[in-house]
């Protein structure tokens, strides 16, 4: 298991912690980038119009609200707990800005590499609200299925060219997660600390690239 510490990035008025980037592509392909952003202010910007091509992005809003505008669907709104999926394919332009909220904003943006055969596919964008996602609540834990299938529950994102499983996991005491053979995976600790397999501490604001096998994760 390999720990990755994030570093400040210039986007989002300097309030971005870049966790995965060029140096981790080989370890977690097709994940290209993971940015964590958080601000209690309401007037921060996330950039002007810019292009994407040959990648997918998934923006997940934990707190606050966001407005996204692109050349595919025009304006899309994302409320707290919702997400935005873009598959740039042959090319698109977009911009994203937080909308006013007394809570500020907190969330993640993840970039994925589209397989070569699909890089010139038709661009696509969609927004998902919190009510579109299903939860698995067991033993005090809460697993929100963002994409893919987990324990028979399927996430709402169904037009991805990649095929990923992403979960938002809140651990009460302990949960067991598994990285399957021939798959790549990582976990990112965005709040609190934990212990994995009773051996290594999981530190907040760090990503951990997983070897294959089962992982017993405890909240400490």
Language-model-derived ranges and their functions:
Residues 76, 82-84, 94, 106-112, ...:
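Generic beta-strand structural signal
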Residues 120-126, 154-159, 177-182, 198-199:
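A short secondary-structure junction signal
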Residues 107-137:
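A hydrophobic/aromatic-rich effector-binding and dimerization subdomain
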Residues 39-102:
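Extended, compositionally biased flexible segments
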Residues 50-66, 111-115, 166-172, 182-196:
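Short, conserved beta-strand element in jelly-roll/cupin
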Residues 89-118, 201-202, 211-220:
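Ligand-binding loop in jelly-roll beta-barrel domains
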Residues 69-87, 179-181, 185-188, 193-220:
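Short acidic-glycine-tyrosine-enriched beta hairpin
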Residues 10-62, 133-176:
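A short glycine-rich, His/Asp/Glu-containing loop-to-beta-strand
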